């Protein structure tokens, strides 16, 4: 089946021609909110408990919702199908998913602790802080993609990257990184998993597993949910790594709530349509921003004509996506005034929602990263990140253009009161 069909029918929990649909079965998967489940015999319950403790995806009998929930499992199966993976494991948030990846890879099956992580900047600010702070006992080496292989040591347990990267939209050649890692494995004598945060691309535009990565990580809060009303994270991977991730989830407790699982499951059905329509809007805005005199730089895959980006848009990623970032020519104060001068676009963190969101990463999503590290990874204070939604692209451009032009003319955000329009306010943090 083609991707769009799988997105709809995997999310409904049956194949399109399943006769059961005509036998009084629910058309939409239900929500199982139970925290615990009864059992007939202690021995049967013990067998099921053992299977879940070992990280199995299913057991003969459900035991406890922290170990397994049918609603969440339905979402996991559907996402794995779209990613071309053996399995996926869902978590309460994207950060819970990333944390589980770091923990699971630090303690592989051979029992040797490998807490060293090789990572490529930029990444999401929370991920950067998790690795840099050593909060869960990890040590990180930040390197350029070309230097990943040389940075791998005997105690390296993970290579982590984002592509496109948050918030610069920098693209990394996944195949090339995987090849460097596999080359280094011969030197150190063990496998080093490669995890790719593919949140910006979604399974619609990119499948890291098919490119050789071991794990494809998502903040499901973003595009997978798509409406700004559900939080979650997920890792698509092999069944071997899925078992390890389920064991981490079982002990740390970062489980996805069943209602969130239901909403994410539902969100997959419209994911291809949303991603492509949002991408079409983003293309238009990126091109217009690149030609606006108040804008000094636009970051959007392919717009600069960079040969690597153009090649990866042919061989790795099936489109640029719908997130872009741009720098305001007059600096950080001017960037602030642009944001505060907007009337339609929502001032809020997060991304991937049906409405358009804007924020300054250096002040919000990447504030936790050291200032020097932010600058070095291409996140200056005058950079604005725009997650493009499903509104009319002309309405979005009119809003951006009036805010940019007001700043260019030196009026700033006082244009709001001059037009008698109160700015939209978001309570999102």
Question: What positions do the PLM features span?
Answer:
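PLP-dependent enzyme catalytic core of the Aspartate aminotransferase-like
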Residues: 86, 141, 183-184, 340, ...
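Short, well-ordered beta-strand elements within core beta-sheets of diverse protein domains
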Residues: 263-273, 322-329, 385-389
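Conserved N-terminal alpha-helix of the aminotransferase class I/II PLP-enzyme fold
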Residues: 30, 41-96, 126-133
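N-terminal glycine-rich, Lys/His-bearing helix-loop that initiates the first secondary-structure elements
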Residues: 1-59, 412, 416-429
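Short, conserved charged micro-motifs
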Residues: 148, 331-337, 392-398
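Conserved PLP-enzyme active-site core in the AAT-like
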Residues: 15-19, 87-294, 299, 414, ...
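C-terminal core of ALDH-fold dehydrogenases
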Residues: 7-28, 32, 333-373
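Conserved small-domain helix->loop->beta segment predominantly found in fold-type I
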Residues: 283-355, 369-375, 414-423
């Amino acid at each position: 089946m083609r991707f769009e069909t799988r997105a709809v029918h995997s999310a409904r929990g049956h194949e399109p021609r399943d006769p059961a649909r005509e036998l009084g079965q629910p058309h939409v998967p239900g929500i199982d909110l139970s925290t615990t489940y009864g059992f007939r015999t202690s021995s049967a319950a013990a067998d099921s408990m053992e299977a879940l403790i070992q990280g199995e995806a299913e057991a003969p009998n459900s035991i406890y919702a922290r170990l397994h929930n049918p609603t969440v499992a339905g979402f996991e199966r559907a996402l794995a199908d779209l990613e071309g993976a053996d399995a996926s494991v869902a978590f309460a948030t994207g950060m819970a998913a990333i944390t589980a990846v770091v923990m699971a890879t630090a303690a592989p099956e051979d029992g040797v602790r490998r807490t060293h992580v090789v990572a490529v900047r930029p990444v999401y600010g929370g991920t950067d802080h998790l690795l840099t702070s050593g909060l869960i006992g990890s040590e990180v080496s930040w390197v350029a993609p070309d230097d990943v292989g040389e940075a791998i040591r005997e105690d390296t347990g993970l290579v982590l990257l984002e592509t496109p990267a948050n918030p610069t939209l920098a693209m990394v050649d996944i195949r090339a990184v995987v090849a460097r890692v596999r080359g280094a494995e011969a030197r150190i004598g063990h496998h080093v998993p490669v995890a790719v945060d593919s949140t910006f691309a979604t399974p619609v535009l990119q499948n890291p597993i098919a490119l050789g990565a071991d794990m494809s990580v998502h903040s499901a809060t973003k595009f997978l949910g798509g409406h700004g009303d559900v939080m979650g994270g997920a890792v698509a991977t092999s069944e071997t790594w899925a078992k390890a991730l389920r064991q981490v989830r079982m002990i740390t407790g970062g489980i996805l709530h069943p209602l969130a699982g239901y909403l994410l499951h539902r969100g997959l059905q419209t994911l291809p349509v949303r991603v492509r329509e949002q991408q079409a809007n983003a293309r238009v805005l990126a091109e217009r921003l690149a030609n606006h005199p108040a804008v000094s730089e636009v970051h959007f895959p392919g717009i600069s004509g960079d040969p690597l980006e153009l090649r990866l848009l042919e061989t790795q990623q099936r489109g640029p996506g719908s997130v872009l970032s741009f720098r305001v020519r007059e600096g950080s104060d001017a960037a602030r005034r642009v944001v505060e001068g907007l009337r339609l676009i929502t001032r809020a963190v997060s991304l991937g929602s049906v409405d358009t969101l804007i924020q300054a990463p250096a002040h919000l999503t990447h504030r936790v990263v050291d200032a020097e590290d932010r600058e070095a990874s291409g996140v200056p204070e005058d950079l604005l990140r725009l997650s493009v939604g499903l509104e009319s692209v002309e309405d979005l451009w009119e809003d951006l253009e009036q805010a940019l032009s007001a700043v260019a003319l030196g009026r700033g955000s006082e244009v709001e009161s001059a037009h008698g329009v109160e700015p939209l306010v978001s309570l999102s943090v």
